[in-house]
Design a protein with these regions (language model features):
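Catalytic-site signature of metal-activated, phosphate-bearing donor transferases
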Residues: 1-153, 159
Length: 162
């Protein structure tokens, strides 16, 4: 997938993103998640197309931010599922990396993810648009997800203290 953000192709930090898009009926299954689910090929082989498909949202930044505020509660629910013992035991999504990331300390993981994308994966080469993309999607959004988890934990501990 080729992300275009504020009119600029984000060539660094997260590119390329490979997604399963076309498959025979019954040859793939969808992950059981609230947010950001992926198709997993259960039989057959995959082939990569030579060219990318373009993901360019033409709405304004306010619309994008509002959408991600809504996404954050679903993402926080997914992380809660991953952290629960029953989900971890069942291998809810089969992705060990996602489980490891979910177990990192709140707020640290969003900072570390931003640094990984922006500095190690060279996101800074995408200019001001790249900074905004990696900051908003890699740090701000992930911090909002962590804040939702933190809020839920605080409410849970307040209920047990009563």
């Amino acid at each position: 997938r080729r992300h275009i953000f504020l009119g600029r192709w984000m060539k660094h930090g997260v590119y390329p993103v490979k997604l399963l898009r076309l498959f025979r009926y019954g040859a793939a299954r969808c992950e059981q998640r609230h947010m950001d689910e992926h198709m997993e090929l259960s039989r057959g082989r995959s082939v990569e197309f030579e060219y990318d498909f373009v993901d360019e949202n033409l709405n304004d930044l306010g619309w994008w931010a509002h959408k991600h505020v809504d996404y954050s509660s679903r993402e926080a629910a997914d992380i809660e599922d991953i952290l629960s013992s029953s989900a971890a035991a069942s291998g809810i999504d089969g992705q060990a990396g996602r489980k490891r990331a979910a177990r990192q300390p709140l707020f640290w993981r969003s900072f570390a993810y931003f640094c990984y994308r922006y500095f190690l994966k060279l996101g800074f080469l995408d200019g001001r648009e790249g900074f905004l993309w990696h900051f908003m999607q890699g740090w701000w959004y992930r911090t909002l997800v962590d804040a939702r988890q933190f809020e839920k934990q605080k409410k849970g501990s307040a209920n047990t203290e009563r």
